[in-house]
Amino acid sequence: MKSQPRPRSLFRIIFGRTTFVILGLLLQIAFFFSIFRWLGNYIHFVYAVYVLISASIVIAILNRPMDSSFKMAWIIPVLVIPVFGVILYVFVQIQFQTRALAKRVSQSIEKTKPYLIQDENVHRQLRLASVRSSRLVDYMNHIAGFPVYENTAAKFFPLGEDMFEQLMKELKAAKHFIFMEYFIIDRGYMWDSILEILRQKAAEGVEVRVMYDGMCCLMLLPYHYPQKLEKMGIRCQMFSPIKPVLSTHQNYRDHRKITVIDGHTAFTGGVNLADEYINRKERFGHWKDTAIMVKGDAVKSFTMMFLQMWDAASSKSKNEEDYGRYLVPVDYKLPEGYTGDGFVMPYADSPLDHEQVGEQVYLDILNQVKSYVHIITPYLILDDGMKNAMAYAAKRGIDVKIIMPHIPDKKYAYLLARTYYPELIASGVKIYEYEPGFTHAKIFVSDDEKAAVGSINLDFRSLYLHFECGTYLYRNCAVADVENDFEKTLKKCIPVTLSDCAHYNWFGTKAGKFLRLIAPLM
């Protein structure tokens, strides 16, 4: 039985936190505009200063080490929107809260480094299997700080409901600790079922921690929901709660989806903890999502990812934790029925270190592909590097296929995505739309050897502005399952042609092209 959306009372809508956040932002915007009007009395002087500052900022933007799409997105408002564009840019560049968050994230990562040391024997085995793939591991070791592992089994789930069933079993079997970190938690069948298990486990003495992104406090959960969980014995934190303050600090969201159980089992993928992700509630037709479970040595990285973000989410002073007690035992053996073949490398991406780790994984797959690369993504808002890599792969004869939603969750993102269709199709990329509904999966699979499954979308927010995570697989048996699911999903899709693109709604096409100019800032 599908769950129904919870009705919101008029009182909660009017006096809820969302309303106060919006009012606070509007008041601050009104204050800035009143300053602009006052400056209008000195228009000639202000205009001369504005032209000088604008020119200086444009030169600075052009010389900054950033993607050209971001440069264009900033130059347009600086030149086109008088005064406000300049103030917006300066405002974004001097954000003390963001610097404080970056410092906490950096410190928490440093604390976990001793637990994420690459086993050179494993690295040597991968180098013997594939020198090219070992180069990606070199990058991960030196830049991102995540090792590659053997002795790890991976199980791929083609739907959220499949993942949910397995997750419930694993949670019930927990003996020592449960860590859960999600972008979205919403009350309903899925979360209520999980919460009941967490409550029971906490009562049994199992350490339970839950962390979710602060966006939830706007529409989905009460602001003081963490206190409710604390009363159940569940430690809980919100990452970066939304506040009625103009700040780019609030732009960096925790988009990750991670569960770690007893240090030996972990889940990640696209599935959040809400009913639409398991098709208990219909929003945009059938919800196609994917997830992956890993068991074994590689879970160590997911454990450290969670602890890194848990520490960074709190600005309060905290005692030093013994992270070692959360690691998988050295003598851990995979359960019967699980095979630890190939190589598994979990990884995380932070928007605060100027390294697009998630994008580099995708680009590495595209640049090394020999036969095919198949992609499922909910969004297609690409920077030049990603777009060119896809086009170049197709032009050299690689089978590049992308599955997109046919029923989008965000109309503006859909209009934006369709502006990329013609140039990609013209270069040889094949694009399909999932006719039954919405694809929320984020997968790359290539050459029957490699796959990446995680939380990372093909858009600027995921690649540049969100905290993300994923799992890279090389010659692991789960790679075949990812490709098989892609082929099954493809049978439910509509191919998109250049003729289709030419007949899209005129207004929608023009709107998409306009939005593309500022897509990196959205």
Question: Which residues does each PLM region occupy?
Answer:
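Histidine/acidic-residue-rich catalytic or RNA/ligand-binding cores of hydrolases
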Residues: 385-387, 414-416, 446
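Surface segments flanking catalytic/ligand-binding clefts of nucleic-acid enzymes
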Residues: 430
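N-terminal localization/anchoring segments of enzymes in phospholipid and broader phosphate metabolism
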Residues: 1-360, 364, 368, 392, ...
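Helical hairpin unit composed of two closely spaced alpha helices linked by a short loop
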Residues: 369, 379-400, 405, 410
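Catalytic-core elements of nucleic-acid end-processing and repair enzymes
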Residues: 442
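Thr-Gly-centered strand-to-loop micro-motif
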Residues: 376-377, 404, 434, 453-454
